[in-house]
Amino acid sequence: MTTPASPTTGVQLLDVPPELAGQRIDNFLIARLKGAPKTLIYRILRKGEVRVNKGRIKPDYRLQAGDQVRVPPLRLAERDEPAPLAQGLLERMEAAIVYEDKALIVVNKPAGIAVHGGSGVSAGVIEVFRQLRPDAKDIELVHRLDRDTSGLLMIAKKRSMLRHLHEALRGEKIVDKRYHALVRGHWPAGKKNVRAPLLKNNLRSGERMVEVNVEGKDALTEFRVLRRFGDFATLVEARPITGRTHQIRVHAKHAGHAIAGDPKYGDEDFSREIRELGGKRLFLHAAQLRVPLPDGQVLELEAPVDEMWQRSLERLND
């Protein structure tokens, strides 16, 4: 008995309609190429096999209305519909919603849940909400949070909302995002900001590491002391003025006050002491969000920390 060959597509030419202007090429292809694994899509993007208007593009290229996307022949696996996600995960994320309207969802993302699947993660927040909201055909992440960071995460249900919020985020002063972080040592009250350029490196393993480097992109984070635990630790508010990868984590380390529970940029001795108090997580939480909506209203939200965070701070205070 022979195994039937996987179906192969021919060259595909895809026109970009006005309502998809601003969408990243990878998300466009994931939505259009049903049955194509994400690994295949990212591979053809990296190799430059996808062309837009007959030219090569980067994997993070944002489409313009009227673009023509050329996709090379692909061998696709025979695939059934995605397996239903665990009911417990669906219920947990439904309960995490702090705001929802016709075009936007905001959740208080738990620590430990990735925003999207891939790299060994079967499903993340976006896959969950595509299953929870099957009628929202254009559902996309507005921005990202690291897997181990908790807090407010925006998900657009309409392309128009996604474009509006991306424009607002690029405006720097228009969207106000504030994080809480538990850091090592005594953060000086006079240290109001950290400005240091950040350079992103992709390791062979696929892991991303960021370092302060003069060749990096300008990055600014404002800090404010919220609470002290002697000279051992400080709870700070961090407001990233720029939006670089791992910005708050690297700026805190650069200032000499690493965030508790940070496996990449943290202080292992400090993190171990916090773990002994029951704090087995990264102590970085997107606590507050202020964002303009298309109708001129301003959405202001706050998200509480989880019980593990609360208990750890109570024990620190004893």
Curated annotation (Swiss-Prot):
GO terms for biological process: enzyme-directed rRNA pseudouridine synthesis. Residues 23-83 form the S4 RNA-binding domain. The active site is at 146. Gene3D superfamilies: Pseudouridine synthase (3.30.2350.10), RNA-binding S4 domain (3.10.290.10). The keyword RNA-binding applies. Keywords: Isomerase, RNA-binding, rRNA processing. It catalyses: uridine(955/2504/2580) in 23S rRNA = pseudouridine(955/2504/2580) in 23S rRNA. The keyword RNA-binding applies. Its EC number is 5.4.99.24. It holds the Pfam family S4. GO terms for molecular function: 23S rRNA pseudouridine(955/2504/2580) synthase activity; pseudouridine synthase activity; RNA binding. It comes from the Bacteria. InterPro entries: PsdUridine_synth_cat_dom_sf, PsdUridine_synth_RluA-like_CS, PsdUridine_synth_RluC/D, PsdUridine_synth_RsuA/RluA, RluA_PseudoU_synthase, S4_RNA-bd, S4_RNA-bd_sf. Responsible for synthesis of pseudouridine from uracil at positions 955, 2504 and 2580 in 23S ribosomal RNA. Belongs to the pseudouridine synthase RluA family. This is Ribosomal large subunit pseudouridine synthase C. The lineage of its organism: Bacteria, Pseudomonadati, Pseudomonadota, Gammaproteobacteria, Pseudomonadales. The gene is rluC.
